């Protein structure tokens, strides 16, 4: 059986989505708050370096370039340390998300099959009505002719 998802009119249904991008973003910031701090420190150092360059203060400019490097190092350390610290939790979360995705795929497949059954029933009903109308027309034709 193919792993491609089955098409359905339920694709845009909101109950099939668990976590929005914004929710994921805020969750990741709460899990690893040092990374945004490192980003902020690096950005601040770059901003101060820009201001120093505009003012012509080469000593402050060099100091801010060093601060930018320290900010990058801090951010890199936070990423590596967070990866080590949250590694097991991330593996468990990926397993959970995989199981959740399988459940959602099964729900979508079931909904799609139900939708196909409904459409099939409607088609059969239409064919029966159409056959009955044809029979009535033939009987009326026989009575006339």
From Swiss-Prot:
GO CC, any one term: mitochondrial membrane
Every HIG1 domain range: 6-97
The keyword Transmembrane helix is assigned to this record: yes
Membrane association type: Multi-pass membrane protein
InterPro entries from the UniProt entry: Hypoxia_induced_domain (IPR007667), RCF1 (IPR050355)
Cited function: Cytochrome c oxidase subunit which plays a role in assembly of respiratory supercomplexes.
Subunit comment: Associates with the respiratory chain complex III/complex IV supercomplex.
Annotated protein name in UniProt: Respiratory supercomplex factor 1, mitochondrial
Gene: RCF1
């Amino acid at each position: 059986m193919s792993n491609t998802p089955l098409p359905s009119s339920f694709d845009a249904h909101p109950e099939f989505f668990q976590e929005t991008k914004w929710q994921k973003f805020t969750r990741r910031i709460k899990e690893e708050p040092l990374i945004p701090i490192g980003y902020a420190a690096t950005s601040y150092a770059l901003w101060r370096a820009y201001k120093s360059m505009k003012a012509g203060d080469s000593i402050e400019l060099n100091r801010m370039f060093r601060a930018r490097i320290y900010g990058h190092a801090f951010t890199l350390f936070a990423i590596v340390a967070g990866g080590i610290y949250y590694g097991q939790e991330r593996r468990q979360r990926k397993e959970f998300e995989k199981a959740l995705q399988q459940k959602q795929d099964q729900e979508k497949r079931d909904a799609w099959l139900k939708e196909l059954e409904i459409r099939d029933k409607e088609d059969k009903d239409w064919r029966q009505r159409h056959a009955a109308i044809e029979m009535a027309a033939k009987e009326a034709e026989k009575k006339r002719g």
